[in-house]
């Protein structure tokens, strides 16, 4: 078993002391009828196919947020769509939980010589247009995979809170990869911290993240898979395995221009996305009243706009190969 740890991010993110805080007022195919049916609650739209499997909305507001997250993660990876040592030419590629399909679309545009790029999701929210080598399917990856197509590369990103049995999912990835094929998992470690003590443990942002973890554990869908991903791919038989770790700030307080940009996007993610995070899980699972959730959401938005709180997430990428 070969496990490599790639170069760690810098020890600390340098703070731009001139970065201002902001006001919260300044803010981003053919299918069956059952698949196209949606649920509406909390003023938002949710998927109807295998309802409840994904606890967050899928409406236009959420789609815009997911596209922004794609840009954020791509920037964190220095404008790379993947880290696996893969030449996509002639390869079959799967994007698990494709969401709006933006990663698959960008892969198709960037690598027109890739033989096939498939994006699957519970929600049919992908565009009808796509590069010639890209197609989308509505499917539940937690069930037995109907598609028996062997892949050369499987990409799985931002699925925290969506999967009940991660080891089983990773075993299915292993089974559907060709020998020598690659699996890449990308997830944030969903416990916030600061390097200078500016994020109190009782902050609204920290309380929200803790509540999301507790709520997802109650429904059997871990909100923090990142710390366990390396172990799961080892147990599935992948070898070699490389672990990469990056830092994502919340806010425009870093001096580094790229981190400042990424932090600004993560700030928007909190300000615009907090309602989507908390609406269902905090009321239906944790038993909070709508008024209590509204107070939390307001506090999260206000803290995210402050540049004197230097909150950080770690972002983990696991790159693992199926042996020949």
Swiss-Prot record:
Coiled coil region boundaries: none
Entry EC no(s): 2.1.1.-
A Pfam family annotated for this UniProt entry: Methyltransf_23
Disruption phenotype: Abolishes the production of most pyranterreones, but accumulates pyranterreone 5.
UniProt pathway: Secondary metabolite biosynthesis
CDD domains: AdoMet_MTases (cd02440)
GO biological process per UniProt: methylation
Keywords for this protein: Methyltransferase, S-adenosyl-L-methionine, Transferase
One Gene Ontology term of the molecular function aspect: methyltransferase activity
InterPro entries for the chain: SAM-dependent_MTases_sf
Location of the region described as Disordered in the Swiss-Prot/TrEMBL record: 1-28
Superkingdom as given in the UniProt entry: Eukaryota
Residues annotated as transmembrane: none
Induction per the UniProt record: Expression is positively regulated by the cluster-specific transcription factor pytR.
EC top class, as a word: transferase
Physiological role: Methyltransferase; part of the gene cluster that mediates the biosynthesis of pyranterreones, a family of antioxidative compounds. The first step of pyranonigrins biosynthesis is performed by the hybrid PKS-NRPS synthetase pytA that condenses 4 malonyl-CoA units ato the acetyl starter unit by the modular PKS of pytA. The acyl chain is then connected to an L-serine through the amide bond by the modular NRPS of pytA. A tetramic acid is formed and released from the PKS-NRPS pytA to give pyranterreone 5 with the help of the thioesterase pytI.
PANTHER family assigned: ABC TRANSMEMBRANE TYPE-1 DOMAIN-CONTAINING PROTEIN-RELATED, METHYLTRANSFERASE
Family stated for the protein in its record: Belongs to the methyltransferase superfamily. LaeA methyltransferase family.
Protein name: Methyltransferase pytC
